Structures are given as C-alpha cells and as structure tokens.
Amino acid sequence: MDTKNTEIKGKERYKAGVLKYAQMGYWDGDYQPKDTDVLALFRITPQEGVDPIEAAAAVAGESSTATWTVVWTDRLTACDSYRAKAYKVEPVPGTPGQYFCYVAYDLILFEEGSIANLTASIIGNVFSFKPLKAARLEDMRFPVAYVKTYKGPPTGIIVERERLDKFGKPLLGATTKPKLGLSGKNYGRVVYEGLKGGLDFMKDDENINSQPFMHWRDRFLYVMEAVNLASAQTGEVKGHYLNITAGTMEEMYRRAEFAKSLGSVIVMVDLIIGYTAIQSISEWCRQNDMILHMHRAGHGTYTRQKNHGISFRVIAKWLRLAGVDHLHCGTAVGKLEGDPPTVQGYYNVCREPFNTVDLQRGLFFEQDWADLKKVMPVASGGIHAGQMHQLLSLFGDDVVLQFGGGTIGHPMGIQAGATANRVALEAMVLARNEGRNIDVEGPEILRAAAKWCKPLEAALDTWGNITFNYTSTDTSDFVPTPSVSM
C-alpha cells in the first residue's frame, strides 16, 4: 500500500521531526465536507517534482494549524478538528501543471463576523509558500451558521429602490470627470448638469479625497447644493457618492458625519481601506440610514491573473458579508477586465439569495445567503449609450449603469450626455417589456429613439462603433467564453 499520503499518528508522529503535510493529517481523500464547514477552492501550481496531493495538504496545513515541523503542543488541542483537510485534487482543464485543490475548514477555526480573521487564515500565509509556484483562491462556501454572524449590507436593493421610488429598470449614474483637478464649484456644476439631465446618481472617483486643488469639505458643500437643486427641479430623488476615504478612521467618520449633516443619502469608500475599516463604516451607515457605495480600487493587482491571487467572486462574497450596498462588478462590454459569463457570476454573488453551482460563471459551490440583504452591482468603465441593449440583456434591472466619459464627454455637453443615456435606457426597457428581442433589435431600437432625441443621436454618432474587444485574462476553465459583439 502507498503510504506517502497516509497520516502518521501516535508516538511515531512525534518522533518524526519533519513529516509531509499529507502525513500530518492535512489530506483526507475520503473526507465528506459537513454543512458547517467553510470550503475553499484553490488553484495551485506546484513546483516541479512536488506531488499535487502534498501541495494541497500544504495549503490546508498552512492556512490552518500547521508549521514546517511536528510540534508536541498539538497534543494540547483537539488537533483532529482544528486541522483543515484537503479532500479533493483535480487537474485544471486545459492547463497542464495546475490543479484545483478543495479544502474544508471546521467552523470553530474562525471568529464570528470578522473578515479580517477569515482572510488571515485563508490567504494569510499560503501564497508565499515555496513549494508552490503560484496559488489562487477561486471560490469559497460559507455555512449558514457563519453567514448569520454578519449583518451584511446596511440598506440593500429593496430599501434603496423604495427611497428612490425607482422600480423595474436599472439606475443610472456617472463618475465626475476629470477625476482630479476641478475646483469645488466647477465640480458641483458637473454634478448638477448630470443629475438635471436625467441621472439618478453622480459619484466621486476612487482617488478624489482632499487634495490641494479641492478640499473635501468644499466638494461636499458644492455637490450637495447641486444634488438639492437638481432634485427640486426634476422632482426625483437624486444622490452623489461622496468619497469619505481618508488616512484614518477618525477622519473618515468626520467626513461621513458632515455628509449626513448636509442631507446626503449615500457615502462611498474604496476597497483599499481594508476589511476592518469597511465593516466599521458599514456599521456607521446602518446606524445612520445611509447607503454605502464600494469602489473596488486596487482589486486588479490580485484578481486579474488566473494563476495567482484571488478571484473577484471571492472578494464579492467577502464584501457582501462585510456589508456594502453597491459594488463595482465589471461591465463585460467596457474597458475593464471581465468576460460576460464570469462577470455575470459576480452579479449572481451580489444579488441572489441562493447561488447554485454554475461552472460557466465560475461558481463552484452552492451558497445560501441566509436572507442577508442583496448588494446592488455597479457597471462602470468604458460604457456608452450605444451599448444599452447589451447591458440590459446581460445584467437585468438591479444594477447601476455608470457612464462617466459617456456622459461628461458628450459633444453637446454634460446635461445632453445624461439625457442621451436616460432616453436610451427608457427606450430599451420599454422595448424589452413589449417582448422585443433587444439582443437582435437593440441598435435599431436606439436609432429609432434617436430620431426624437438629438442628444442620443449625437451619442450614437460619436461612440456607436466604440468597442473594447480584447481577450479576457480571467475566464472560465470549463466552457468556451464568448465575447460580446456590437
């Protein structure tokens, strides 16, 4: 019998000094995961000569209780329960040398309601492990008992729609451009023009905080003046994502309180502030009836490459637990990374009460969200009115469609850019509701609407043929991944 991956127990274990991870009990090919286990799927690339099962056991060990040698203090713990267990290893289809490694963790290993603690175990150490050329966390499954220790989004999609009194169609937004350099007064003018033209939201970008050209307080004052004026003139509830990201939590709370005092309904933070800060701001938003918008700034440094890092679907799961109301999830048709099925998988993580296994969309596990509120996905980055049929078909109603350059760059002005997007959306939703095939008839529907809307006509003439047809880096490993054609 081959014993190289068989656990060594008893006194022989503690005489051994250094054992293989599989021999220390971190591999169990017969293990059946429990409903209460936290499950993780890693993509691993072992060094030449390293047994994939041993590599998988090492991942389980180094993300739970192991160190490089046997330690007698294991005997002071319930080590059989505390050890994570790699229980399945499969070759990655079409990628020699890479393996999918499934690992189960007993729920007792994790602090309740703490993304910081969860990530310290799952990704804290294993990604630097020498026997692995590369490792990537592809997906996770959280038991209901663990999900219930989190409060989730402070507002959720249903309550947000009730506050806006907007139902049955996507929300519209735009990012103020240029990102940097505008004075507070000019910034507020851009916000007013976009909202007056028909958008629901305008937003700060990820790197606009409090720079010499525009102090944060000036921005907040001019922006909220614009929001209130546009709301009064249109009769619609409007908002602007005020970015409160700062160098300390104390300063972030100070900015959040000022935004609230001005009547803002929403604040924004960047992913780079960290999970503890995100959970803290989420709790503040919950206590103060504020919507929390999350910009995923920095995620591409570790989510884009298929062989090493963390899939964005995992980040989306962590952020739903941590408690954000909006999350940038990609566009599939815009300028940023993401093929259609993969991006749809991110949206499913945000919006569904229960995720089923869907390998085409990168979902390897079922996930019961235990009535945790839903996150509103945001599609932003290189999109324009000419793609409205694709965006509506891909993502449905519960999404914020943000046209930054596609609003601010309109040849007839900002307000005209907003109007073009609003008319394009209304025309496409109407056509869909009438039973028309918007995938096929989309361009025709837009051109018909443009006959009665000069701003839309100008938008289609300016950007109608603009596409970003590049091969996605992060794609499904199980099915062909089609591109979206205009």
Swiss-Prot record:
The modification N6-carboxylysine is found at K203. The active site is at K177 (proton acceptor), H295 (proton acceptor). Binds 1 Mg(2+) ion per subunit. It catalyses: 2 (2R)-3-phosphoglycerate + 2 H(+) = D-ribulose 1,5-bisphosphate + CO2 + H2O; D-ribulose 1,5-bisphosphate + O2 = 2-phosphoglycolate + (2R)-3-phosphoglycerate + 2 H(+). It comes from the Bacteria. Substrate binds at N125, T175, K179, R296, H328, S380. Mg(2+) binds at K203, D205, E206. One of its GO terms (molecular function) is magnesium ion binding. GO terms for biological process: reductive pentose-phosphate cycle. Keywords: Calvin cycle, Carbon dioxide fixation, Lyase, Magnesium, Metal-binding, Monooxygenase, Oxidoreductase, Photosynthesis. The record marks K335 as: Transition state stabilizer. Its cofactor is Mg(2+). PROSITE patterns: RUBISCO_LARGE. Its EC number is 4.1.1.39. RuBisCO catalyzes two reactions: the carboxylation of D-ribulose 1,5-bisphosphate, the primary event in carbon dioxide fixation, as well as the oxidative fragmentation of the pentose substrate. Both reactions occur simultaneously and in competition at the same active site. Belongs to the RuBisCO large chain family. Type I subfamily. Heterohexadecamer of 8 large chains and 8 small chains. The basic functional RuBisCO is composed of a large chain homodimer in a 'head-to-tail' conformation. In form I RuBisCO this homodimer is arranged in a barrel-like tetramer with the small subunits forming a tetrameric 'cap' on each end of the 'barrel'. PANTHER family: RIBULOSE BISPHOSPHATE CARBOXYLASE, RIBULOSE BISPHOSPHATE CARBOXYLASE LARGE CHAIN. This is Ribulose bisphosphate carboxylase large chain 1. The lineage of its organism: Bacteria, Pseudomonadati, Pseudomonadota, Alphaproteobacteria, Rhodobacterales.
